[in-house]
Amino acid sequence: MKYAAHSRTYSTNNYYFCPIIYKSTNYCTMTQDELFKVLVAHCKEYGFIFPSSEIYDGLAAVYDYGQMGVELKNNIKQYWWNAMTRLNGNIVGIDSCIFMHPRIWEASGHVSAFNDPLIDNKDSKKRYRADVLIEDYLGKIEEKINKEVAKGRKKFGDSFDEEQFRATNPNVLREKAKYDEVHSRYVAAEKANDLAEYKQIILDCNIVCPISGTCNWTDVRQFNLMFSTSMGSTSEGANTIYLRPETAQGIFVNYLNVQKTGRMKIPFGIAQIGKAFRNEIVARQFIFRMREFEQMEMQFFIKPGTELDWFAKWKENRMKWHVNLGMGAENYRFHDHEKLAHYANAATDIEFQFPFGFKELEGIHSRTDFDLSNHQKFSGKKIQYFDPETNESYTPYVIETSIGVDRMVLAVLSHSYKEEQLENGETRVVLSIPAPIAPVKAAVLPLVKKDGLPELAHEILSELEFDFNCQYDEKDSIGKRYRRQDAIGTPYCITVDHDSLNDRCVTLRDRDSMTQERVPIDSLRSIIDSKVNLNNLLRNLK
């Protein structure tokens, strides 16, 4: 294979090029559980995510972001922030405090209603969310049905009629009847908040503890998820306050300040990125469910009566934002809520196909005027909006979009992690992170640590580092350095060789295809920018 540039020919037989070309894109065979464990280990090994307080044996469900993880996280946040505030002239930002007046959480309903139904297995001493146990059971039934459908499709080929198959196949009908019965009981129990029925469903379905394998369950109990602490100089004079369980309330209590000082007219939105805290009794699946996490929320204030139209628009808008990353539209789906939260009249989740199944990535809710009306009631302050066009005052309705930053990080990492079988039998580990949000955009690699190559490499680095997060690496063979960059998701590697001193050209290697081309040093910035600039993603959203 040859690469031509400026009348010169560079052969892949030259030792400084990566000598391994794809035989095929075959991923190593692993179960989803095995893949997830490998991913967690990879995140630690390459500086993405560490267990918090590890030298003290860690703290359950609390994680720290390393040097690669914080770059990825910041890039995701920038993508969201710019999509919200730059592409929408009627959406502005805010940064509210974690500590707020405790009455805020009474008004929002969190003090009385922010609970999870939990159940313990007496043999393993492990605690679980009862609703999640039932939902996972229903998910397994769905998997059985889908497997039967897949078998039918394989058997009948092009003549396969899925609708007819689902309506007539005895195995599908049997599983569907089982699903419908359990699902209807579950929905009724949710609406009635019937904790005894939760347990009865678990017993009737013979749902066992994953650890002990037994059905020896306690009764289901409700646990409030808010962390409380004290504010004051002495314990006697201290007031109980809460670490915020969501960022939304900081927007609601400030919405009128923003509206007046920004001369905002309805419809308008307020965006915020910030930490939230929930005392998750059952925290698991790595950074998917943590006790300290980060949210990206936007509250969109609208005229009452228009909420369902705006709800539909924001559903479409948010799904487009996700799919725009290029991680496959088939990996996303909407899941409408059957049991609505106390503040909502419509709600849906955007779910992503994680290694452990489709799970919530973002929530979109029509919150009506619940929050603003309650804050007006509890504070005694009028916080209505005066509409100059209709000359009337009213309490706006709100459409909320809420996404977990940590879940987005996990979605990107779990989708991007690949182990590829190469022609020489070796396995290449690569993170095919979308280039605009990759932690490192380019690595500058001198072929050897002498003959003036490091000096030229540093010259290139000093020009690129103003525009991109770059790395310099001169240790080990060029092949090993390529592998290190593949493992952290660097889209481009720039190899500086002896010919570079004369022709001022370098070898640019693409992460995903491993193809290489000879390019002038003066063209590097524009070539890389065309692939990794975040604005490329944003333009697709217009």
Region roles according to the model:
Residues Y16-F17, Y27-K542:
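NTP/phosphate- and nucleic-acid-binding module
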Residues M1-T29:
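N-terminal amphipathic/basic-hydrophobic helices that include classical n-h-c signal peptides
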